[in-house]
A protein has these predicted regions:
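Pepsin/retropepsin-fold aspartyl endopeptidases
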Residues: 1-48, 53-144
């Protein structure tokens, strides 16, 4: 999993599976730190995500996972991953719902990272289900 900002290009994505009616594209502005941060909802609880197109799946910190009601002590951390802070092990989970900027997806594959992840990541297991993801120098547009 990487922490690099989204590339400045347009990338139409296939496989949007939202149960909600089509919505307008939502804009996420680049933060002062150079990253795109998104306020989302997972299973009805707020989570602040770093948008990471280099992450293959949504990745949760143990603290966020616990706030969502996941029993992190009972998860099986057997999936090796690579983060900017080094190698770690993660536990695979499935999230009932993930919503960001009006785009709600059901049954989203995710991992809970055992250590080394400073913030939860909004990765491709969610982003890849959008109908369109457009990145410019300053803005990320999410089209459900």
């Amino acid at each position: 999993m990487s922490y690099s900002p989204a590339p400045a290009r347009e990338a139409p994505l296939r496989g949007a599976q939202s149960s909600d009616p089509p919505a307008e594209a939502a804009a996420i502005a680049k933060a002062a730190d150079g990253h795109f941060w998104a306020e989302g909802q997972v299973n009805g609880s707020r989570v602040r995500f770093l948008v990471d197109t280099g992450a293959s799946s949504v990745a949760l910190t143990p603290m966020d996972a616990q706030r969502l009601g996941l029993n992190t002590g009972r998860l099986i951390y057997d999936t090796p991953i690579h983060t900017a802070n080094g190698d770690s092990l993660a536990a695979r989970v499935r999230l009932a719902t993930v919503s960001v900027a009006g785009a709600r997806m059901r049954d989203v594959d995710a991992v809970v990272v055992g250590r080394g992840l400073p913030s939860s990541l909004l990765g491709m297991s969610y982003l890849g289900r959008l109908s369109r993801l457009t990145a410019t120098q300053d803005t990320l547009l999410l089209q459900p």
